[in-house]
Amino acid sequence: LGVLLTICLLLFPLTAVPLDGDQPADQPAGRMQDDISSEQHPFFDPVKRCCVVCNAGCSGNCCP
């Protein structure tokens, strides 16, 4: 059974299967547009140009 599976994978590699195209991994540009930028984050302080509370969605000069 293992030999048959190996032969099938050699003849028809998984990379030959076309992707459906609607998965997030297939559209990196769309994923970048979905991310919230630091300036639009609710904890962003425009005076200090950083977040008051550093968390996963916010970055800036104040956050490590």
Curated annotation (Swiss-Prot):
Primary location recorded for the protein, binned into one broad class: secreted
UniProt GO cellular component terms: extracellular region
UniProt keyword annotation of Secreted present: yes
Residue ranges the record assigns to the propeptide: 17-49
Superkingdom of the source species: Eukaryota
UniProt subcellular location: Secreted
Keyword tags: Cleavage on pair of basic residues, Disulfide bond, Secreted, Signal, Toxin
A GO molecular function held by the record: toxin activity
Tagged with keyword Transmembrane helix: no
Tissue: Expressed by the venom duct.
Cysteines joined through disulfide linkages: C50-C63, C51-C58, C54-C62
Pfam families, alphabetized: Conotoxin
Signal sequence, renumbered to the chain: 1-16
Domain statement: The cysteine framework is III (CC-C-C-CC).
Family per record: Belongs to the conotoxin M superfamily.
UniProt-recorded name of the protein: Conotoxin Pu3.5
